[in-house]
Amino acid sequence: MAATSSYTACTKFSMLGWIGGKRELRKRRAFFISAQQQAEVEESQQVNAQEEEQEKMKQQGKQKLPRPVEPQVNVKSKNMSREYGGQWLSSVTRHVRIYAAYIDPVTCEFDQTQMDKLTLILDPTNEFVWTSETCNKVYAYFQELVDHYEGAPLTEYTLRLIGSDIEHYIRKLLYDGEIKYNMNARVLNFSMGKPRILFNDGLPQNVQ
C-alpha cells in the first residue's frame, strides 16, 4: 500500500501556555541507610529490574494499536476563530504533516475550529510502501507523543517536536526493514539514504 493515509488524535494541549504556570521542581530529599540495608536495596532493585525487563518483553510482543477516533459527518471547512487570529497551526516535513484541525479522511474538508484534535497525514508523496500494520505503528507512536505532551502549549514548536520524533521513527522502520521505498513513486531521491543490499556470506556471489 503506497496511498497516503491520515489519523486524527484528540489532544489535551493548553492554548494559554502551560497549565497552572511554571511547573514546580520536586524537592530533593537526602537519606542515609546502613550497609545491610544497602544490600537489601540492591537486591530489591535487581528483582525489580528483571520484572521490568520481562514486562517490556511482554509489551513488545503485543501489537500497539492507535485509539479509535469516531468519524464525523457533514464536516465543513472552517478557519480558526478570530480570537486566535486565524493562525495556521501546522508542522510539515517530508513524510509527516500535522495540523491542529479535524480533516475528513474522505472529503478532505478542513475544520480548523476543532483545535482539540491533531490530524496526521502520513507520507503524502508516497515515497514508501506501507501496510496497515506499519501505518498503525506510526499512528500509535503519534498517539503516545500526543499523550506525552499533554499540557504543553499548542504551538507550532510543539507540533514540530512531535513531527521530528515521527520522522526518526519512520527512519527506524526503514532501517529495520519494516517499510521499503516505493520504486513506483513519482520521484526517487531516497531521502532517508540509498537502499542497502544484504548479502549472505555463506553463499558464493556471482562475480565476473
Swiss-Prot record:
Recite the UniProt keywords alphabetically: Chloroplast, Membrane, NAD, NADP, Plastid, Plastoquinone, Quinone, Thylakoid, Transit peptide, Translocase, Transport
- Provide the protein's localization: Plastid, Chloroplast thylakoid membrane
Chain intervals for the UniProt region annotation (Disordered): 37-70
User: GO molecular-function annotation terms?
Assistant: oxidoreductase activity, acting on NAD(P)H, quinone or similar compound as acceptor; quinone binding
Which residues lie in Low complexity bias regions? 37-49
The UniProt entry's GO CC annotations, sorted and at most eight, read: chloroplast thylakoid membrane
What membrane topology does this protein have?
Peripheral membrane protein
Q: Does the keyword Chloroplast apply?
A: yes
Query: What's the family?
Result: Belongs to the NDH complex subunit M family.
User: Is this entry keyworded Magnesium?
Assistant: no
Catalytic activity reads: a plastoquinone + NADH + (n+1) H(+)(in) = a plastoquinol + NAD(+) + n H(+)(out); a plastoquinone + NADPH + (n+1) H(+)(in) = a plastoquinol + NADP(+) + n H(+)(out)
Q: What is the lineage of its organism?
A: Eukaryota, Viridiplantae, Streptophyta, Embryophyta, Tracheophyta
- Give the record's subunit note: Part of the chloroplast NDH complex, composed of a mixture of chloroplast and nucleus encoded subunits. Component of the NDH subcomplex A, at least composed of ndhH, ndhI, ndhJ, ndhK, ndhL, ndhM, ndhN and ndhO.
In the database record, which residues form the transit peptide?
Answer: 1-21
Q: What does this protein do?
A: NDH shuttles electrons from NAD(P)H:plastoquinone, via FMN and iron-sulfur (Fe-S) centers, to quinones in the photosynthetic chain and possibly in a chloroplast respiratory chain. The immediate electron acceptor for the enzyme in this species is believed to be plastoquinone. Couples the redox reaction to proton translocation, and thus conserves the redox energy in a proton gradient.
Q: Which gene encodes it?
A: ndhM
| InterPro entries listed in its UniProt record | NdhM
Name the enzyme's class.
translocase
EC code(s) of this entry: 7.1.1.-
Protein name per UniProt: NAD(P)H-quinone oxidoreductase subunit M, chloroplastic
